[in-house]
Amino acid sequence: IIAMTADHLASTIWPGYGKEWWLLGIHLIGRLAAPTMWFMIAEGYQHTRNFKKYLQRLFIFAVLAHFAYNFCFGISLIPFRDSVLNQTSVIWPLFLAAIGLYIYDDEKRSFPLKNWQKTAILLVLCLLAFPSDWSCFPVLCTLHIYQNRGNLRKQVLGMVAYISMYVIVWCLCIDVVYGLIQFGIIIVWPFMHFYNGTRGKARWMKWFFYVFYVGHLVLCGILRLILHGNVTTIFGG
C-alpha cells in the first residue's frame, strides 16, 4: 500500500516521464504493488469461503475504482475517447483474473469444461482486460501464481517472463526507461517470503484495501486539480 501510494503521488505531483534518479526510484518501488495484488487475488481465491461474494466485491470496487482512477489521472470517463490503453484501474483485470481462476479450477467449478473451452474463455478475459492498467497481464500472472502455489521462485520468474512482453510494448510505444522499470516487479520476491500461506483472521482487512485504493485515488485526483488542472479535467482531457 505504501509503495502504491508513493507511486501514485509521484505521478500526480510530477506527471510525465521525468528522469530524475529519485523519481525513477519512487516508481521502481511502486512496482511492488501490482504483483502483490496478483498474489492477493490468487490467495484470496484459494481461501475465500464464498467465491460468489468475493467476485461481487471485486466487481463493485472495479466500478468504483474506474471513476476514481480516471479522475486521479485525468483520463476521460468515456471509454476509448482518447486511447484504447489504460482506460480503467487494475481492479478490473483483478476481477477478471478471479474469474479466470474459477475457469481453470476443475475442483471448485460447478460445471465441466474442456481444455479448449478454458483456453478460449481465458483469451476472452485477456481481451476484456486489455484496455486497463497493466493490460491483460494481471489475468495471466495471477493464473500463473495460482498454478505454481508453494513455488515462489517459479511464481516470480514466470511473472517476469510475462511482463517482458509488457516491457517491450512500453519501450517501443511509450518510454524506454519507464518500460524497463516494469521489471521492478521482481523486488516483490523477498517480501513474499514473509507470507505463510494462511488465511488472515482480521475480517476488516478484506474491505480495507479496496476502500483505501479508491479513497487514495480520489485524494490524488483532488491534488492533481489543485496543482495542474481545472474543473474540466474532472472528466479527463
Segment roles from a protein language model:
Residues 1-237:
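Alpha-helical transmembrane segments and their immediate juxtamembrane cytosolic regions
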